[in-house]
Amino acid sequence: MIGKEVTVQDIILELSEVQPEVLPVDLFCEEELPNEQETEEEPDNERISYKVIAPCGCRNCEVKLRIFVHATEFGIRAFQQLLTGDLQLLCPDCRGNCKHDGS
């Protein structure tokens, strides 16, 4: 290139043969796709042990409760949603001080 601006005459293209290791992959290979029944995910029923640490549900209490559960992945996710939603756990001291309808 001579000068500050590029002109078409300054560009030289060199075409070479494609190397065998960089040939495109044949997308129409003999691979078979699974049918719809095989693609349905089966629920994972494997149970795993978890340690859950949650705060006491009383406003003035700072006790951390430890709960050990054995649950599936779906079960622990459901439990997590309960704990972050309307369900609150109480420590033994706060349970004795609260009025409740159960025994």
Swiss-Prot record:
Post-translational modification: Highly phosphorylated.
One GO process term, biological-process aspect: symbiont-mediated perturbation of host cell cycle G1/S transition checkpoint
Motif Nuclear export signal: positions: 76-84
Motif extent (LXCXE motif): 27-31
Effect of S49F: In strain: Isolate 5a5
Top-level lineage group: Viruses
Chain residue ranges for the region called E7 terminal domain: 1-48
Protein's UniProt keywords contain ATP-binding: no
Annotated keywords: Activator, DNA-binding, Early protein, G1/S host cell cycle checkpoint dysregulation by virus, Host cytoplasm, Host nucleus, Host-virus interaction, Inhibition of host innate immune response by virus, Inhibition of host interferon signaling pathway by virus, Interferon antiviral system evasion, Metal-binding, Modulation of host cell cycle by virus, Oncogene, Transcription, Transcription regulation, Viral immunoevasion, Zinc, Zinc-finger
Principal location class: host cell
InterPro entries found in the cross-reference section: Papilloma_E7
Family: Belongs to the papillomaviridae E7 protein family.
Assembly information from the UniProt record: Homodimer. Homooligomer. Interacts with host RB1; this interaction induces dissociation of RB1-E2F1 complex thereby disrupting RB1 activity. Interacts with host EP300; this interaction represses EP300 transcriptional activity. Interacts with protein E2; this interaction inhibits E7 oncogenic activity. Interacts with host TMEM173/STING; this interaction impairs the ability of TMEM173/STING to sense cytosolic DNA and promote the production of type I interferon (IFN-alpha and IFN-beta).
Free-text function comment from the UniProt entry: Plays a role in viral genome replication by driving entry of quiescent cells into the cell cycle. Stimulation of progression from G1 to S phase allows the virus to efficiently use the cellular DNA replicating machinery to achieve viral genome replication. E7 protein has both transforming and trans-activating activities. Induces the disassembly of the E2F1 transcription factor from RB1, with subsequent transcriptional activation of E2F1-regulated S-phase genes. Interferes with host histone deacetylation mediated by HDAC1 and HDAC2, leading to transcription activation.
UniProt protein name: Protein E7
Gene: E7
